[in-house]
Amino acid sequence: GFPLSVPANIASLELGRSEKGDPGYWRWQAKNITATLKPRQPWLIHIQTTAHQSSEFVDTKNQLRTLKIVARVAKGIVEIGSDGRLAAVSTRFEALGLTGTALPGPVLAAGLKASINFLRDTRIDIQGDSLRLPREIDPLFGENMDVLRAKATITGPLPRNWSRTEITAWRDEGGTIDLTRGRIKWGDLDITANGTFALDARMRLQGSGTASMQGHNESIKVLTERSMITPLNAAALTIGLNLLGQQDKDTVKLPFSAQNGQLKVGAVSAAILKPLQFPGE
């Protein structure tokens, strides 16, 4: 009869772009992959592996970084567009461990989901659950982070690498980042945010959005107990957040904006925004 699915075993698979040392270079490799294609949906390829994966890439400072991925379960779906090009990728990891020079130390996660869609605008959605952060970074609110989420749409042609030429071209073509949902739940602190951002003529972030915070009073107390801020600064920060934001039970909502090199929370200037830096500058 007509097969419901066609399985294939792949001993080793390697994907990448450019040559090692070139801007935009990256490589990903995995072994012992099971791939399944369903004739009724030939544009979708389901993949799964329990073997470790490795990756290397050139970062924004033109330095080669490595990343090793170990997971109890690693599944993914690759979608091929009608033109034969890669259209979308989604992955799911369980009991995930990350190590390598791309990180300051080992990172563990109970689960990680990621998806990216390349059709027209680029849509990205990444969420990590029950993360254990590396001790090397001296985590502010402990080593355990409950949720880390970023869901965004990037308009304009995606830059091929982190260089002034590529990023300028993206900006000049009207490139924007629309953060539809960002979330960090870390200790008592629970922050969600959304906004739309771009780059100004001097390569500084510009845009606006809204952030909502819960557990901020408790988190300020933790920072004070760890001597990371003084009691006086803690009192000023607590009062400032409550004055600038709109109270809704235990939630504070804060409008923020980035313009002319200044980050403002409400009408108050909170930080100076510097231009982006590129390799060789």
What residue ranges belong to the model's regions?
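Extended terminal
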Residues: 1, 167-172, 198-203, 208-210, ...
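N-terminal beta-strand/beta-hairpin edge segment
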Residues: 1-119, 129
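Outer-envelope beta-barrel architecture signal
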Residues: 6, 122, 203-205
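Short, surface-exposed coil-to-beta transition loops
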Residues: 28-31, 190-194, 251
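Low-complexity, intrinsically disordered segments exposed to solvent
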Residues: 40-44, 50-54, 75-77, 81, ...
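Short, surface-exposed charged micro-motifs
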Residues: 77, 113-115, 181-183, 194-196, ...
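Acidic, serine/threonine- and glycine-rich low-complexity intrinsically disordered segments
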Residues: 92, 97-187
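A beta-strand-loop signature enriched in Asp, Gly, Thr, and Trp
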Residues: 176-180, 190-207
